[in-house]
Amino acid sequence: MKKNLLLTLTLCLLAQWSVAQAPKWVEKAKRAVFSVVTYDESDKILNTGNGFFVTEDGMALSDYSLFKGAQRAVVINSEGEQMPVEVIMGANDMYDVVKFRVAISGKKVPALVVSPTAPTVGTSVYLLPYSTQKDRSYTAGQVKEESKVEGQYHYYTLDMHLKDKMVSCPVMTADGQVFGLAQKSSGKDTATICYAVGADYAMSQKISPLSFNDHALSSIGIKKALPDTEEQALVYLYMASSQQ
């Protein structure tokens, strides 16, 4: 009995120490993390997961798997407020990322700054979970390996245990910038290893004139954004109309 009590007290003290040691930016940064709920064509819940804002006007990142087959989606912020996903801005099914814009309810939302540089191997990193509580909880780990995606973007192996409900939560540098989206590992190393696709790669996803035939995008029933330039947008609209 005494041993169990001692163990409980020790765990509580460790948890309190972890929160006390949390970087000062954690509580504020967690406000940019949200829950995502997607719905199918019958308006029944399809999937639930996580995502986070990367601009104050509502641009956000999450995992593609969450949106595949969805006809609509909403995000629920740390205050419990629901906001609809307005348009899909890009997606990649191989690396399981999606970029989208949320129809925000106010003038701006809390957003994370995407790190311009990749953290080096051995660097301490922090995963921020979605929470409606104002706390500074996080999961700490280290960068185990770093590799390239398409020659210029990044993919990471992390020394970090990832729970199911933490997929697509932001992984942060020590100075509070997001560099990756958390992804699950498979096999025998799931207890100690997880992965993160670079936030830089997720941000690079976009709609091009040829995106109308993109299988990953067409598998999402939510409205797509137009390409960035007027010329590309006209080509995209022409391609779309010719397929109808």
Model features per residue range: what roles?
Residues 21-23, 38-57, 63, 81-84, ...:
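A conserved glycine-rich beta-strand in the N-terminal activation segment of trypsin-fold
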